[in-house]
Amino acid sequence: MALAANKLAEVEGGQVVVKDGQVIGLVELAIGGLMSTERAETVAEKTNTILKGFRTCGCNLNNPNMQLSRLALVVNPELRLSDKCLVDVTHFTFLPVIEGPAK
């Protein structure tokens, strides 16, 4: 997790897949973590490294990087996860991630 977070900080946003201490997929999205300054063809090639990385890690979901992107985009309806907390977008409130003592 630390390697992934540090890599994203280094490239100023994007998507990364890490396995066994190695970055195996990376696409830099330096504009708000959503858009790239690179040509579409280059971004498509890098996005393929993300998809291959997910498959290498055992994820067989259809287009998992887009599913994860939707989760974090806090302007979408319902609940969203931000870098700060869980957001109830419908009621414009922040929700605790952990409620009460762990059992």
Regions found by a protein language model. Give the residues of each.
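Active-site microenvironment of metallo-dependent hydrolases
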Residues: 1-103
